[in-house]
Amino acid sequence: MAAAQAVEEMRTRVVLGEFGVRNVHTTDFPGNYSGYDDAWDQDRFEKNFRVDVVHMDENSLEFDMVGIDAAIANAFRRILLAEVPTMAVEKVLVYNNTSIVQDEILAHRLGLIPIHADPRLFEYRNQGDEGGTEIDTLQFRLQVRCTRNPHAAKDSSDPNELYVNHRVYTRHMTWVPLGNQADLFPEGAIRPVHDDILIAQLRPGQEIDLLMHCVKGIGKDHAKFSPVATASYRLLPDITLLEPVEGEAAEELSRCFSPGVIEVQEIQGKKVARVANPRLDTFSREVFRNEKLKKVVRLARVRDHFIFSVESTGVLPPDVLVSEAIKVLMGKCQRFLDELDAVQMD
C-alpha cells in the first residue's frame, strides 16, 4: 500500500522539501510504471481535461486548466505573450518636434501605447509597403503646441496654471480614418486604450506635430504587439497535515502560511488547525523554519492542475485573447499534421 502511494505521488505531485523539490519531471509515459496504462487515449483525455473560469473582469482572467501536460500549458502561455496579434504604432512621421524628447525616443514611446482596435478586422501589411491602406493601417495625428496662459496669476509657480498644453497625453492623439474606415468603425472605437498616458512635457513655444501609422503584428516581432500585460500560470498547491495540530501550535502553523490557507477551529474546547484553502498559498515554505511544525506538514503541487492568470493591456478582453490563443495553437497543430502528411506522401 505504501509503495502504491509513493508511486502515485511521483506520478501526480511535485513535492516541495526544505532543501529541494522532488518529482519535477513528468514520468507518466507508457511502460514507465508497472500496472499503469499510460498510453495515449483520446477518450480518457477528454474525460479528464477541463477548464474552469474562477474570476473574470474587464481586463483580467483567472482560470484553471486541468488534465494537461506542462509543455502544452507553457506553449499556451507563450502564445498569449508572443503570437496573438494586435495593432501598434510602427511608423512615425515627424513634421515638427521641438520638445526635449528626441525623435527616436518619442517614436519608441508612441509604439508602446496600447491601441484599442480589433486586430481581427485588419490584415498584415505586406513587406516593403510604406503607404498602407484601410485594410492594414490605422492612422493617428498628434499636434500639440504649448503656450503661456494669459490668465495665470503673476505670483503663480504651478505649471498647470502657467502654461496651456504643457503636458502631452494620449488623449491628444486623433484618429484619422483611411478610406472607408469612418463608415466601418463607430466614433470612439479606434483610440488609445488609456487617455492619460503621459507622452512628453512642453514649455511655451515648443511643439509636437507628427503622424502615426499603426499596423498588425505579434509580440514575437516586438514587445509592443504583445496583447497581455502578464500571462502566467502556477500549479495548484496541495497541503497535507500528517498529524493533528492543536493548541498554540495551530495558531503558529496558521501564521506560517498565507492568510486563509490554514484555518483554526474550536473543537471540544481545543484549537485545531485544518487546511481551508490551499489555493491561496504562495509556498514561501516558512513552515520549514519551525523545527516542530516542519515534520507535520507535506507541501506539494498538483502536476496537471494549472492556475492561469491573464491580464490584458486593454486592447481586447481577456477571454477573447484566450480564445485567439487557442486558435493559434490549433493552427500550429494543423500545420504540423500537414507537414507529416507531406513527408509520408514523399
Curated annotation (Swiss-Prot):
CDD domains: RNAP_I_II_AC40 (cd07032)
Keyword field contains Cytoplasm: yes
A Pfam family reported for this protein in Swiss-Prot or TrEMBL: RNA_pol_L
GO molecular function: DNA binding; DNA-directed RNA polymerase activity; protein dimerization activity
Signal peptide feature range: none
Keyword Acetylation: yes
Cell location: Nucleus; Cytoplasm, Cytosol
Gene3D superfamilies registered for this protein in UniProt: DNA-directed RNA polymerase, insert domain, RNA polymerase, RBP11-like subunit
GO biological process, one term: DNA-templated transcription
Domain of life from the UniProt record: Eukaryota
Keywords recorded for this protein, A-Z: Acetylation, Cytoplasm, DNA-directed RNA polymerase, Nucleus, Transcription
Major location (coarse): nucleus
Summary of subunit composition and partner proteins: Component of the RNA polymerase I and RNA polymerase III complexes consisting of at least 13 and 17 subunits, respectively. Pol I complex consists of a ten-subunit catalytic core composed of POLR1A/RPA1, POLR1B/RPA2, POLR1C/RPAC1, POLR1D/RPAC2, POLR1H/RPA12, POLR2E/RPABC1, POLR2F/RPABC2, POLR2H/RPABC3, POLR2K/RPABC4 and POLR2L/RPABC5; a mobile stalk subunit POLR1F/RPA43 protruding from the core and additional subunits homologous to general transcription factors POLR1E/RPA49 and POLR1G/RPA34.
Annotated function: DNA-dependent RNA polymerase catalyzes the transcription of DNA into RNA using the four ribonucleoside triphosphates as substrates. Common component of RNA polymerases I and III which synthesize ribosomal RNA precursors and short non-coding RNAs including 5S rRNA, snRNAs, tRNAs and miRNAs, respectively. POLR1C/RPAC1 is part of the polymerase core and may function as a clamp element that moves to open and close the cleft.
PANTHER family registered for this protein in UniProt: DNA-DIRECTED RNA POLYMERASE, DNA-DIRECTED RNA POLYMERASES I AND III SUBUNIT RPAC1
Family per record: Belongs to the archaeal Rpo3/eukaryotic RPB3 RNA polymerase subunit family.
Name of the protein in question: DNA-directed RNA polymerases I and III subunit RPAC1
Species whose genome carries this gene: Bos taurus (Bovine)
